[in-house]
Amino acid sequence: MVKSYAPIQTYEAKQLSYDLLNNPKDFYKHNRRYATSFVLNVTYGKRAPIWECKEIADIYGCLSRFGRVRRPGSFIVDTFPSLANNPIYNMFSDWRRVGEDTFKKDSEVFMGFWNDTKERVKDGSAPHCFGKVFVQSDFEDQGLDELTCAYTWYTLPPRPVLSVSISDSFSGGFLEGGSETTSLTMNNCIVGMLSNPSVIQKAHEELDRVVGSSRTPTFEDEPNLPYLRQIIKETLRWRPINKLGANHYATQDDWYEGFFIPKGSIVMVNWWALHYDEKRWRDPEKFDPDRMEGRTMSAAEEAASGDPMDRSHFSYGGGRRICPGTFPQLYHLHSHPRAPPGSLSLLHFQNSANFLQGMHIAERSLFLNLSRLLWGFNIEHDKDSQGNIIPVDYTLETGIMPGGFTVPKPFAARITVRSPERAKILRQQWEVAQKTGVDFSDITFDKVGNVKM
């Protein structure tokens, strides 16, 4: 299932490399465009060929609103729900207005994608994508309305066994979350490598030895590029994707190391304490992929292990609210917290063939783009007109954007192609890709997402 997305990932990665050749100063935006275009392709069979397009503006508008409501301490009512009915608190807090405004604006975006997909399914122009399968499914028989489907963006499992109540997960699920998580990890990786330039040199040496200079890296090279995998693991340890992760809910009274946890308590995984534990990680604030040497399991294999010490990081979460993809018996249908009562948010199903393996897909995108970036380019600190190095803020205190995700503030870097020969290969790859389009599940569509008849 995961490998079926390879043509789309490869296609978008080729444009990313081409964009870096032509306009390297905008690498921050290029990484964001890649991630958004890929998930748009998978979910709705549409591309985001440039950063300045309506689809990206709509999605990042949703992300901005999500960041506001998800920012730690934004609304105390999240910690003390009883305040929702307190008239004095409601006089001075705009939490309800913000929530209703967010739901209204997000719904307009998501229903826009949903209705566009319905029209393309009707006229036969919709390529193979999850949105198409969802539109053609019997979602109404499953108790789902169109608004819930628009927030969900996953295929329905064939035989639902058990439904559970609405979860307070990411609104828009895969599309909204997938747009930012991959790009912020790539940009955090660049920040980390700038803080420790020896990492770039080691990666260049490994890629030159394994891949050479006459071709670009492919997914098949991954087992032979352990240092690249170490860089990805260290990035996710050094800068977790989400600042606080998903809330967990205690379904019964429990005790942990002498602490009583009442039923109904909100419990969160403190991955900052785990990732920066000096007993486990020497000099944890340093970006150092060498510490991941010998950790050969994939992120999903680590997460599925019964031993938490097997995990190199907890950026994908843990427990029943872990990132989709680890446990195939769980199928997440994320609905908005204000979706109509009774709409499904989590379905357990028997056939795992339709499971959207988000964690695996993210890992493959990170590997492909990082390997192509380091194969083709040098990465250095940028300099101003006087020749002075432009500093990059490596700190957590001031180097991260406000909001729920660990997004680095925009920063300067000097990205240059490693040789004219490599530039020629990267340029030719994108020229060919534009002519041939994307071949995905026996359906070929062009560079803007239209089906090629």
Located regions from the model:
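Conserved cytochrome P450 K-helix/beta-meander segment immediately N-terminal to the heme-binding cysteine loop
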Residues: 269-304, 339, 430-431
